[in-house]
Amino acid sequence: MVPADATTWWALADNGYAWRTNSADFQLVLYRIDPRWGDPGGPTVQETVVLRDPDRRIPWTIVCDPPHGSRLPGLGFNALPPSPPACGDDPAARILTGFDLDPESFVRLPDGTFWVGEEFGPFLVHVAADGRVLEPPVGVPGVRSPQNPFLAISDRARAEAPTVAASRGFEGVAISPNGSTLYALLEGAVAGDDPQDLRIYVFDVARRSFADHYLTLRLELPSQQVNLASLMDASGAPVYPAAVAPPAGPVSIGELKAVNDRELLVIERDNHGDDLAAPRFKKIFLLDLPQAPEHGGRVGKTPLLDLLAVPDPDGVGGDGDFFRLPFYTIESVHMVDERTLLVA
């Protein structure tokens, strides 16, 4: 989420129904929402912006290209109706679907346009305030997922093996305060890298190009099991009464957000929660960018907040002295002011 104005926020929908192959009928959208903090009626959607490509900036066939086919593998378009509902009534709009792109992160520029980080390429995609794609998606040289569309339409690309796993693209994108630089964080390690190291690519907005160097985020691999007795609801009952803390395993990132010119926030989380298994690792870290970056150099890293043990001395959350956010995917953080974070 990123702020739209004093009371509303922009939020980005994922690619649809969890999988590429079942998301061809899901429109990609940005929502402007009013959280209405404390209102029992809950948040309201103030505006919906549908992502589309009427100017044909995307150089491969998309779902909403009549006759609604695609050269991308993995989807039988003969199963789609003659006019897929996601494509709307205007074929020229070329509405984008969850089969075309997998948006995972975004930033808003001072001019009101958006840069969206996605995972199929992975690509950075420049989008106007009204949802139009403004220019061809930008990929990192040498970084390709198995779902990269050029693997299907380019003989040269087809001869090159994917270098990052599926669904491990630009999960986090941050923008510098002056709007000149994007920091794009992969969710998975590039082939040949240490699996615990993720690359942060530096993108020059004016030049529309990635820097020759990248930075490295060293992921945590927590080995300590969570104390299940500490995961209690307001009545004292265990939150996960039948769960067993999982062994040490993979950690994912959920968001990257700039604090200032030198510092970033990142969410790291395990893949547990939502009644799967007891979550034991959901944290926000403060990253320190090197003043003289070296190719592959690691960013500094300081623990900032444990989302399974947020101090709650006033009992606002109703869980006692600590509030816990034990959800499987925690995917947004924003620094509202010097003492306040928004986490979603």
Each predicted region: which residue ranges?
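Sequence/structural signature of beta-propeller domains
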Residues: 1-344
